[in-house]
Amino acid sequence: MLSGAYLRVLNERPGQAVLWSLGCQRGSASSTEGNRCVEAAEACTADEQCQQLRSEYVAQCLGRAGWRGPGSCVRSRCRRALRRFFARGPPALTHALLFCGCEGPACAERRRQTFAPACAFSGPQLAPPSCLKPLDRCERSRRCRPRLFAFQASCAPAPGSRDGCPEEGGPRCLRAYAGLVGTVVTPNYLDNVSARVAPWCGCEASGNRREECEAFRKLFTRNPCLDGAIQAFDSSQPSVLQDQWNPYQNAGCCFLWVSSMSILTALALQALL
């Protein structure tokens, strides 16, 4: 069930949507209240397009379709599915999953695991490679290079501007960051005690290109423009998700329209919440 709320079919007709009732008890509070990452996951599950794209990357990154054998995933398939998720999914919902704010380690760990880091991010190696390796691959890639340039143009500090960041760059910065997910420089949250993000790489073994390596990594780890854009989105997230709820609701009950064809997949995805 959706985070402890009871689920009831109010109306169902073949080929039409189903109106589900979520926790319709006057005065009762959802167990997800205050956990924006769970709220974002539930909102995605309730949206047919978001849920379908999410189930696709789950299948490729975590399911049998995306794994060669124990401990070995087909990373190219996983990353392709992630690119499709952000390219075709509703930005309000995909970004809510990516940038949801957390106040505790349990929420932060759920957020860190949302986009299958064992396959899409870090892989089986114990130590991260030099950032120069994925950076060089990205700059040679027709798919990755323009995405990285867009991220640099939209998120890199701009000393000449009013606040030191690109003008009105917050939403563009988040879109550009999301565009990197599924590339060879896929970023993710680094731990469950902070909101630090970076690709899976370091600069310890960078030789005489250490400065170049550090400059690239600091675009993620020490970037006030990226940090500010994420914080601004987190502040607006409740109103963003509110727009996804069906207008047929009252003070004690909220409803979601869910395709009858997506019910089983939606319930299966609850394990990821």
Swiss-Prot record:
Gene Ontology terms for molecular function: glial cell-derived neurotrophic factor receptor activity
GO terms for cellular component: external side of plasma membrane; extracellular space; plasma membrane; receptor complex
Xref: SUPFAM superfamilies: GDNF receptor-like
Residues making up the propeptide: 251-273
UniProt KW keywords: Cell membrane, Glycoprotein, GPI-anchor, Lipoprotein, Membrane, Receptor, Secreted, Signal
Glycosylation: residue positions: N192
Alphabetical list of InterPro entries matching this protein: GDNF/GAS1, GDNF_alpha, GDNF_rcpt
Tissue specificity field: Weakly expressed in heart, brain and testis.
Job of this protein: Receptor for persephin (PSPN), a growth factor that exhibits neurotrophic activity on mesencephalic dopaminergic and motor neurons. Acts by binding to its coreceptor, GFRA4, leading to autophosphorylation and activation of the RET receptor. May be important in C-cell development and, in the postnatal development of the adrenal medulla.
Family indicated by similarity: Belongs to the GDNFR family.
The protein's name: GDNF family receptor alpha-4
Native source species: Rattus norvegicus (Rat)
Gene responsible for this protein: Gfra4
